[in-house]
């Protein structure tokens, strides 16, 4: 259920510029979104897996907080992330 090193590195370089820039909010949101997608697929196959559902909800909350922070700090970067990840609005 975790991201492979190759997928994680690709997401980091796409949103962070280089593979060392993991602390950037855009990178964190992108990694959360990728993990949410994988967990959603897992839960469709295993609907009674309550522990994974709780983990999914926690990651959704973390992504929501990171997006709220990004919206307050830099609205242009926030809108760009929403467009790149095909999220709401």
From Swiss-Prot:
GO molecular function annotation: rRNA binding; structural constituent of ribosome
Keywords: Ribonucleoprotein, Ribosomal protein, RNA-binding, rRNA-binding
GO cellular component terms, semicolon-separated: cytosolic small ribosomal subunit
GO biological process: one example: translation
Record CDD domains: Ribosomal_S15p_S13e
Superkingdom of source: Bacteria
InterPro entries hit by this protein: Ribosomal_uS15, Ribosomal_uS15_bac-type, uS15_NS1_RNA-bd_sf
Gene3D superfamilies for this protein: 6.10.250.3130, S15/NS1, RNA-binding
Its biological purpose: One of the primary rRNA binding proteins, it binds directly to 16S rRNA where it helps nucleate assembly of the platform of the 30S subunit by binding and bridging several RNA helices of the 16S rRNA. Forms an intersubunit bridge (bridge B4) with the 23S rRNA of the 50S subunit in the ribosome.
Protein family membership: Belongs to the universal ribosomal protein uS15 family.
Assembly description: Part of the 30S ribosomal subunit. Forms a bridge to the 50S subunit in the 70S ribosome, contacting the 23S rRNA.
Protein name as it appears in the record: Small ribosomal subunit protein uS15
Organism: Chlorobium luteolum (strain DSM 273 / BCRC 81028 / 2530)
Lineage: Bacteria, Pseudomonadati, Chlorobiota, Chlorobiia, Chlorobiales
